[in-house]
Amino acid sequence: MYRLCLIATLALSPALALAQTAPTTLSCDGAFAKDSDYARIVKIFGAANVTDEKIHSVGVGEIKATVIYGKDAKRRLEVVWKDEKARKNPFVMAKGADSAWKTEDGIGGGASVADIEKLNGKPFKLYGFEWDNGGLVSNFNGGALAKRKGGCFLGLSFSPPDDVGAELYKVSGDKEFLSSDRNMRAVKPYLWQITIGWQK
């Protein structure tokens, strides 16, 4: 019995080791470089931690995605391939205020607009809430976050808290607001999605 347990443990250990040591950093190189592909994702995170699923895309519906740590809500990461047939050129999404994923400069789920404004070095623009692109940062206004080391782009989306009041309607709709807008600050939106990808 002991021998069987030992064999099972040894068989699982590579996947466990990868799960424990694989990074949770969103950067323009390594696993998520422009030339990355499905094989590289599997090599870095382990086959046991990588699955193919269908996810919901706003305004599109269900799309195919490669999911890393699909059973772990905090470490779950969704990868959509720009070259779907070859599964190359990743578009990567970390969702949720409690996501373990962070960018190299420390941007993580749950951050406030003030937190991101500080990292950007100046106010940025984001769309109003209550529509498909609600809360999406539309322009970093030439701030520090406008360009990423390595050349990929950074996408950020904010969400209002569940208990938000009538003040939400002052910053809703298909129009842009500054992160420094007093009505936007009053809503206290939090960062719920971080995206990195490539324009071409």
Regions found by a protein language model. Give the residues of each.
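Positively charged n-region of N-terminal signal peptides that target proteins for export
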Residues: 1-4
